[in-house]
Amino acid sequence: MENLRIVPLGGLGEVGKNMMVVEYGRNILIIDVGMMFPESDMYGVDYIIPDYDYLRGKEDRIRGIVITHGHMDHIGALPHFLQEFTAPVYATRLTRGLIEVNLRREVQKRVKINTMAPGDVLRLGPFKVEPFHVCHSIPDTVGLGIETPVGLIVHSGDFKFDHTPVDGWPPDMAKLADFNRRGVLALLSDSTNSGSPGATPSERLLTSAMEDVFREANGRIIVATFASLISRIQQVMDVASNFGRKVAIAGTSMVKNVKMARELGYLDVPDNLIVSLHEIHRLPPQEVAIMATGSQGEPRSIMGRLATGRHSSLRVVPGDTVVLSSHTIPGNEETVHRVINQLFQKGANVVYHPLSPVHVSGHASQEELKTLINILRPQFFIPIHGELRHLKQHAALAHQVGIPERHTAAVEHGHIIRFTENSMEGGERIPGGYVYVDGSWVGDAISPSILRDRNELAATGVCYIAFRYNQNQGQLIDHPVIQTRGIASQEVLSDLVIEAEDIVRRALKGIAPTTTPDVVEKT
């Protein structure tokens, strides 16, 4: 019998760009195709996508792409992937809407996007995929039970055990019990909060925190969050309505997502609650709320531009209250802290987690993670979704509840894991890493050496020297033009510029004149 191979292409050993390959014989199932934010020293990089070179040459083996939910770290690389690969995509209704918002029309025409629902059974080659409902910070999130020829694999997706969710749909504990009855070969489980003791609070707690903010604020309220957090957008809209405030939406992605979610029925918002950014200037500040993108402080986002005063129609003024309703993604701390300081400098009152409970995590903490393992009792365990420290901590939790150490595999992306009906073993690590996206440039155009050059330019600046030189006479025609950027002010550099001119002249004196003139022949 063939081995089953699990090939993580992203999301293990890092936060973001989640992508998993499940392979049996000449059949491939893909789970999620996400992106991640760049680190602060990756100058000019918009975002990072998985390296899926492993799949090139295997396009005809891909039986389907199954998406667990609509956050960008799970769907953000799909537009790039589907430009190159044609395979059917399966997603829940809201997730499908979020995918289509980001796909070019020609890709949508070429690729079939199928709507699935918890309880469905997808037969994709030798794989029988059973999506089941889990709670997360976005509606329509699923985990996956995957029947394979060697056994049942359970992929948790991003999850937590929220028994009082804002959408009224608790996790499907009965399905988890059913998986236990059938026997689970391996559990692949979300590790994001594996270092957090206890259990993650319910999303409902966020409503009371927002009510406190709205009750105390006398001026405008600006709430920044991820554009895909549909449940959170609903909560803020409800609170704003209860406090007599109109809501304006700022940020292209949030405008598109709100429109789509309203059309699909995932946002229940009366038409008279939403106003345009232009209309808020005619309203008293105490009657205005603004929902915006940029909770991670991205320079080109709404919050990034508001913090630096570069937004065309909005300004942060004294008396405004700004709420950052999100967790700071690892690597973004410096950027977020800079934005918070800039907003304070402009006179705003800034409310942010963890100083105020205006954000609730969508990921399971330690007691929930142990509960999932105890319910499923898998033979083997692979922690997924997180930095290596998160994966190792999750593996330690699995040992606490009885999973033998030799039955766990805490590995980073690229490590192949092989399964038979009663064994798991690590294989080789395939080459791969980050694929950088900078505007329309993707991949090889932005190599690590390019990023090193950008870092060096940022650290040391650049100097340009231009001159006209008579090659026949061996003489400068006029003074060299020397310009600098990012080195020091012109006043400080004036003496150095004169010295640089002398260096140029001395260097050119060592070049012998050319006695034979260049000839351009007419043909």
What are these regions (language model features)?
Residues 195-325, 329-331, 335-354, 358-378, ...:
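Hard-cation-handling environments
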